[in-house]
Amino acid sequence: MSNSGHPKDRGNRRGLMLVLSSPSGAGKTTLSRMLLEEFGDVKLSISATTRPPRPNEVHGEDYYFKTPDEFHRMIERREFLEWAHVFDKHYGTPKADTVARLEAGEDVLFDVDWQGADALHDQMPNDVVSVFILPPSIEALQARLMGRPGSTPELVARRMEDAKREIMHWRRYDYVIVNDDLNVAYQRLKRILLVERLKRLRQIDLEDHVRALLGEA
């Protein structure tokens, strides 16, 4: 059931950027989906990309589809919080869209690797809350990857090497969750979100409230 939060609370706080990273197979996508289903005021970040749309993908909902020239102009105008070149295509996070959502009191969820998390933090350090999801063991991670459709020993071996490289950067994150029980991991992620929403720097009306209490309004 969606929980959009108290309308007054949303209006009186600045949203946050919840950045999730993990090695492939650690459960990040499932945890993200659970959070989006429960909290109506948490929105998934929409990336811009130069790859062509797949069937049923909608511009402005799944991605912002751009030509290479359009994408490069956005880079030149510094319109991205972060961008990357992946398999001959470009992907990037438009800054204006994220800022508008934060100012509206919405939280924006990011699914990025450690380099993307670093770039987002460099651009907007006061807004980023970063969480790294770890598997309970290397054996469990390998079993999850082997269980995916289309997996081959070669593909799993490559993903395991990628996973170890990603795990090496766990200390860069504000929070770390070991996903050995999905429901427990989700409750921890949810508590992180709720506590971070209450931080002083996100309560945008507090300064006026304190001035009124002190008779300075």
UniProtKB/Swiss-Prot annotation:
<dbReference type="InterPro" id="IPR027417">
    <property type="entry name" value="P-loop_NTPase"/>
</dbReference>
<keyword id="KW-0963">Cytoplasm</keyword>
<dbReference type="InterPro" id="IPR008144">
    <property type="entry name" value="Guanylate_kin-like_dom"/>
</dbReference>
<dbReference type="GO" id="GO:0005829">
    <property type="term" value="C:cytosol"/>
</dbReference>
<feature type="binding site">
    <location>
        <begin position="22"/>
        <end position="29"/>
    </location>
    <ligand>
        <name>ATP</name>
    </ligand>
</feature>
<protein>
    <recommendedName>
        <fullName>Guanylate kinase</fullName>
        <ecNumber>2.7.4.8</ecNumber>
    </recommendedName>
</protein>
<keyword id="KW-0547">Nucleotide-binding</keyword>
<feature type="domain" description="Guanylate kinase-like">
    <location>
        <begin position="15"/>
        <end position="194"/>
    </location>
</feature>
<comment type="similarity">
    <text>Belongs to the guanylate kinase family.</text>
</comment>
<keyword id="KW-0808">Transferase</keyword>
<dbReference type="InterPro" id="IPR020590">
    <property type="entry name" value="Guanylate_kinase_CS"/>
</dbReference>
<comment type="function">
    <text>Essential for recycling GMP and indirectly, cGMP.</text>
</comment>
<dbReference type="GO" id="GO:0005524">
    <property type="term" value="F:ATP binding"/>
</dbReference>
<dbReference type="InterPro" id="IPR017665">
    <property type="entry name" value="Guanylate_kinase"/>
</dbReference>
<dbReference type="GO" id="GO:0004385">
    <property type="term" value="F:guanylate kinase activity"/>
</dbReference>
<dbReference type="InterPro" id="IPR008145">
    <property type="entry name" value="GK/Ca_channel_bsu"/>
</dbReference>
<keyword id="KW-0418">Kinase</keyword>
<dbReference type="Pfam" id="PF00625">
    <property type="entry name" value="Guanylate_kin"/>
</dbReference>
<keyword id="KW-0067">ATP-binding</keyword>
